[in-house]
Amino acid sequence: MNRPSDVPFNAPAVERGMGFFETVLLVGRRAVLWEPHLARLYGTLRRFGFPEPDLPSLETSARTAADEAALPPREERGLRLAWIATGPDLEQPASWRLDVTVRPIPESTLARRTGSRAVTLRADLRRDTPDVKSTSYFAAVAGLRIARRAGGDEGLFTAPDGSYLEGTSTSLIAWNGGTPARAPSGALPSVTAAAFLEGGEDDVPLTAALLRRGALLCGSLTLAVPVVALDGAPCTVPEAMTVRIRDFNRRLLSDPQLGTML
């Protein structure tokens, strides 16, 4: 397997952020929500008509990466699947390359699991194509930097009307009195959030007032976590939300139905 150091400096992936990726939670050899992650990756490529990685080769690469990592059964890592453009002709499969790597979960992500201190991002900072999981990641990188400089651990993008959309690397859900709600549009279709919601959700504008009455973030490595503060002001953390988060995270880490053995 080629390594990132082999990518030419003038590759579309480097110069233009041309590529797609998925980050999968790996618990031992168990890839959490593996099939939904693959469905999102291949669905995006088919939607735009880009060449696709050979699925058996991808699965073999993932198993090889898991072999090399040799994780104990309960140890967690991030499994990164990256399909990046290294050649100039995007119509040619030979211009694309698959990289599969196992990485430590960032300490900042692990710290967020105890409760997120979210920061509202400036209105002019937004993703170029928010419903696509691409490597064009300026807004996310800049947004997280802004949040950290403000004393937070996650930045929240907003819509033109001021309502909230999602985090830089997480999905945003309002507890909404026990009927969880997401933004109607303008956010990535999150694999982890979909598993948490199980099809039961409302689509409503996520206002600051609504979030302060109870909200959570979902991400493949973050898991589900309560938002404990927004722009420095404490948020309510309803007990029922806490219970559901705890049960969901337990299932993510241990339920065979929510993972695939590599």
Question: Residues of each region from the PLM?
Answer:
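Helix-start/capping segments and mature chain N-termini
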Residues: 1-56, 60-64, 91-262
